[in-house]
């Protein structure tokens, strides 16, 4: 394992912050889509609640594991695997033809998000110092608020 820290630079910081938006937008965007999901999949109120909740549960359950995997196998690798898993799970959500398939895909999305998020914050903490670190963490927090709002649009 290579433990040397290389500053991500401006492009890297933008990539990390963009990656931060994916899981956070997905936290709130599903609420907007619930009406559109109800009729084609004949989803009950309980199933609609599960569509929202399973993502958060999978994210919370896998978050510490995602952080440890990033420490052991490399943050860049885990970030890329997380984005890939998240993207594939998003595609599966889009083509789901049953409520069970959608629930499974939402769970996978949460697991993918749990691989993405810890790599971002760890990379920022390890690679940046002083004012650059403070600015990056401020942007990280600001992106969280913006992403949640964007998801509701």
PLM ranges: what are they?
Residues 2-153:
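Transmembrane-helix bundle of Major Facilitator Superfamily
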């Amino acid at each position: 394992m290579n433990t040397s820290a290389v500053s991500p630079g401006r492009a890297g910081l933008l990539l990390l912050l963009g990656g931060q938006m994916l899981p956070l937008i997905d936290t709130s965007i599903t609420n907007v889509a619930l009406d559109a999901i109800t009729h084609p999949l004949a989803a009950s109120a309980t199933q609609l609640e599960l569509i929202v909740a399973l993502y958060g549960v999978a994210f919370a359950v896998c978050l510490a594991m995602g952080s440890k995997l990033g420490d052991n196998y490399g943050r860049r690798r885990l970030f890329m695997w997380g984005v890939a898993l998240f993207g594939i799970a998003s595609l599966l959500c889009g083509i789901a033809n049953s409520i069970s398939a959608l629930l499974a895909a939402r769970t996978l999305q949460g697991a993918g998000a749990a691989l993405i998020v810890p790599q971002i914050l760890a990379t920022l903490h390890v690679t940046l110092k002083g004012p650059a670190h403070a600015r990056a963490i401020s942007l990280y927090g600001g992106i969280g608020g913006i992403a949640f709002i964007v998801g509701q649009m």
